[in-house]
């Protein structure tokens, strides 16, 4: 299975991990300096869930993001599935 959420379209993003050195100015230091920059990936918070579909009268096993789960709690599974189909996720 891919790491893309079928309901929200969230997918892994690219970014950097910074290595810092020094003492923060908040702690009365001279400030933090960047000593290294490494490429990394930021992954969405994916969960495998079994959700009940009232239209199909059965459980659906979906690998969705945590934000999609909040949308389902708010709007209902059928409405979220309709939106995902219309947006072609």
Curated annotation (Swiss-Prot):
Q: Which UniProt keywords apply?
A: Ribonucleoprotein, Ribosomal protein
- Which terms does the UniProt entry file under GO BP? translation
User: Gene3D superfamilies from the entry?
Assistant: Ribosomal protein L28/L24
Example GO CC term: the record gives: ribosome
UniProt entry tagged with the keyword Ribosomal protein: yes
Return one GO MF term: structural constituent of ribosome
Q: Which PANTHER family match?
A: 39S RIBOSOMAL PROTEIN L28, MITOCHONDRIAL, LARGE RIBOSOMAL SUBUNIT PROTEIN BL28M
Family in the record = Belongs to the bacterial ribosomal protein bL28 family.
> What is the protein name given in its UniProt record?
Large ribosomal subunit protein bL28
Q: What organism is this sequence from? A: Chlamydia pneumoniae
Source organism phylogeny: Bacteria, Pseudomonadati, Chlamydiota, Chlamydiia, Chlamydiales
